[in-house]
Amino acid sequence: MGKYNLILSEYLSFVYNSQSAVQIPIYYSSNSELETRCIEFHAKCVDNSKKGLSLKPLFEEYKDVTDNATLLSILSYSYDKYNAVERKLVSYAKGKPLEADLTANELDYENNKITSELFQSAEEYTDSLMDPAILTSLSSNLNAVMFWLERHSNDIADANKIYKRRLDLFTIVASTINKYGVPRHNEKYRYEYEVMKDKPYYLVTWANSSIEMLMSVFSHEDYLIAKELIVLSYSNRSTLAKLVSSPMSILVALIDINGTFITNEELELEFSDKYVKAIVPDQTFDELQEMINNMKKIGLVDIPRMIQEWLIDCSLEKFTLMSKIYSWSFHVGFRKQKMIDAALDQLKTEYTKDVDDEMYNEYTMLIRDEIVKMLEIPVKHDDHLLRDSELAGLLSMSSASNGESRQIKFGRKTIFSTKKNMHVMDDIAHGKYTPGVIPPVNVDKPIPLGRRDVPGRRTRIIFILPYEYFIAQHAVVEKMLLYAKHTREYAEFYSQSNQLLSYGDVTRFLSSNSMVLYTDVSQWDSSQHNTQPFRKGIIMGLDMLSNMTNDPKVVQALNLYKQTQINLMDSYVQIPDGNVIKKNQYGAVASGEKQTKAANSIANLALIKTVLSRIANKYSFITKIIRVSGDDNYAVLQFNTDLTKQMIQDVSNDVRYIYFRMNAKVKALVSTVGIEIAKRYLAGGKIFFRAGINLLNNEKRGQSTQWDQAAILYSNYIVNKLRGFETDREFILTKIIQMTSVAITGSLRLFPSERVLTTNSTFKVFDSEDFIIEYGTTDDEVYIQRAFMSLSSQKSGIADEIASSQTFKNYVSKLSDQLLVSKNVIVSKGIAVTEKAKLNSYAPIYLEKRRAQISALLTMLQKPVSFKSNKNTINEILRDIKPFFVTTEDNLPIQYRKFMPTLPDNVQYVIQCIGSRTYQIEDSGSKSSISKLISKYSVYKPSIEELYKVISLREQEIQLYLVSLGVPLVDASAYVASRIYSQDKYKILESYVYNLLSINYGCYQLFDFNSPDLEKLIRIPFKGKIPAVTFILHLYAKLEIINYAIKNRAWISVFCNYPKSEMIKLWKKMWSITALRSPYTSANFFQD
């Protein structure tokens, strides 16, 4: 068995190293005779350990079990409440503890003072500014590091260098923590006043970040970067990450492009050997020098030195070090400010009357025209989504907070909740539901605030608006996004696009006479000057649209939307400041509306168009592309002569002056070769991503359990690794060991084995081989998968009680009645299930389900019972196929050039052989005709699971399903009678299988699955027309080949002679595949 189990048993003997500690392995087998031996073996182990006898003779006696059965879990038993961490830590605490500079940050509480100096008493204390918000403790993290160090203390050669580097860095951490003692966490993994009062306030979050950084050290450069960040982030909790990552916006403009990929007319990336020289005016170098000086000012030495050394020849080869520094800077942890400072930051902007009114006017008009353009067609055609906008809003209502806690009665049960969906049900039940009235958010009813924390930026505030705002905006915004989907300017929403094509989009037009202007407008989006022109533009657009229709329902939808904008122009917010809640007038735009993303994009587009129209008064150029992506916008301008330093200098200064005329505090840059925006950056014709996901600190506490967080940790590790920031895998596995263990009693713990955590069951947490998703097909794997299926869905008493209450039932039937023309059990049941699922975000229900699941899991981890079901898993389908596959060694030449330098070697190799994918594989079923037919007449959106179920029904039932959703009978019967229906059957099955095989996640999303190079390695004789079977055989063959290539950097070809007699059987089986949701899949989804 794999490396995980080895690390597991070593880790257990490392942590529980006393005489009294016992570890009992538990095995299982799908073979009933061997299973009996497994049970005997376990019983005797328990017996021996009770008598204090050695387990060694049993391992001899039961060699058949240890050789042939599968390890299920390890039961660990230890008397001593261990303060082992402190004891072990002392031997590493040989260095000088760090001393915090208590004047390093502007805001007093951001200095790393002793907690009792920041908070005089337990009442005043809050951990919200330093809460790691992750369900694992500092002591576990220290244990994991010391375990790694102990395991590798005898490494030789290069491995020994890594050991020494990490040991040296850990000495700093250990010495500092040892000075104050290891802070003990409570059962919720929080650090209370009593524990923290005599320790530096930021000790825990700093130590977590430092551990994450030191366990990501491999080379000498890593060591220098990490050391500097670890030492300085102990004092500087505010600006360090920002200062370290600032230079990147200029560095991208310094490298010549020598060969790059461009997007061609067919929306594919193709190589172009063009050469573009980086033309850099002196002023740019001055700005860069100033950034470097600012870095030196706060005590950085090595990082600015590395940047300066790179500047000598600005080579692309050595640029990876620059991108490394850029990624590392985020790992110092989140900057968490007090809400009052986060809010006042946006209120402090001085408002000047001296602005260019003409430009503001143009800006407002552009917003107005864009809104009209986006909504014109749906409004003129009286689109059903706009007519039923309220219903559409209710169906997609989230279970997020509604801003206030309320007492709600469900039948006999009374609960307190802040959730939107529960408030809606409550209001409907009491006749207080008035979607036609948008509640004011003025001084009488100020908006409660949420927060968003990011490394290297200030904390931002989020409006928590009443649900009426969501209902009013939902349908209209959906229509706006639909327009954005086929408008290239909106890089985020553009349907055919992805990060790679957007990259080829820019490089396509770069040449000696083109410059690219890129601006970060995040400050502008939340500035006060933006709010009046912004909201007014939207309001004017909506007024124009109202005159284009006579349908009262559409007019009503537009009017409600307009009302949200009017209300928000006079908005007040509640800001907690200590124990008081302050009311402040808030003039800026904040996230929290449904329209945030769409409206910001529209405004950014209007802004850059306004700027370009001013520049055009002075220069003659053609605008080749304009793109907006979130807070960033960029444009490529083509001039009729070659560019000179002076031209770039002039354009740059003019652009800045224009922004200044609008009092927009933005960072505008001009370059000839590269850009840097929040999501990605382009340098030397290659594309880079920032690998800045924190592993051991989280932004906020959600209601995910330790298992979920272990899966998220692994998923974050994978994303960072693909982007060029690698953390030691053994360390990650050790964290998974810690976070997935289940306590039975104080001294008894159960540790699941690799098989449990990597089989795709409801408990999957990670992959045994990075980047490769395995679908186990052996008897033992399928057996354990079936065993876990039985305990996937747990009941919750509270949820059942709520669901059986009149309040809940009335709400569900209200939705069904509004949605359906005639009875439709599938949809009504679907709505009820969806609404019941929304209840999961209510903590008591979640906890109840989780407890039930953990206790079932405990039973299962000690003795699995396989479970009979008529559902198949994808594993069983693949198990039927596998025996007919014959593989032989083969080879593929490297034929594509690198364009993403940060990728790990094995992934890079596969892409260079088969090419990269520039399209999303459709895995939602939305391209099928039935899905399009439904969306033409109804606001209801069936999930891929529902479509999969419906499309396999009898034709009569499908027709009834369609008619009940408002599809006219003639369309429905025409659909069932046509050939399209059988094509749909195939399309939906295809989407469903893609969805199950996570083809759009991890590194699979980078590979071209339709690559002709890949196809030629597969030989499957064609036998009769069952396209679905042909499809799954091909897909499985491709996965086998790609997985083999990732693992071995070598290629195989696959021959499959699938018997015709088996094909029908397989085809029937393919219509009863069940989807498995696990912490692993939700972590993948969460990455999205």
From Swiss-Prot:
One of its GO terms (cellular component) is virion component. Signal peptide: none annotated. It is an enzyme of class 2 (transferase). Keywords: Magnesium, Nucleotide-binding, Nucleotidyltransferase, RNA-binding, RNA-directed RNA polymerase, Transferase, Viral RNA replication, Virion. Its EC number is 2.7.7.48. It comes from the Viruses. InterPro entries: DNA/RNA_pol_sf, RNA-dir_pol_4-hel_dom, RNA-dir_pol_luteovirus, RNA-dir_pol_reovirus, Rotavirus_VP1_C. PROSITE patterns: RDRP_DSRNA_REO. Residues 501-687 form the RdRp catalytic domain. Pfam families: RdRP_4 (PF02123), Rotavirus_VP1 (PF12289). It catalyses: RNA(n) + a ribonucleoside 5'-triphosphate = RNA(n+1) + diphosphate. Its cofactor is Mg(2+). Interacts with VP3 (Potential). Interacts with VP2; this interaction activates VP1. Interacts with NSP5; this interaction is probably necessary for the formation of functional virus factories. Interacts with NSP2; this interaction is weak. This is RNA-directed RNA polymerase.
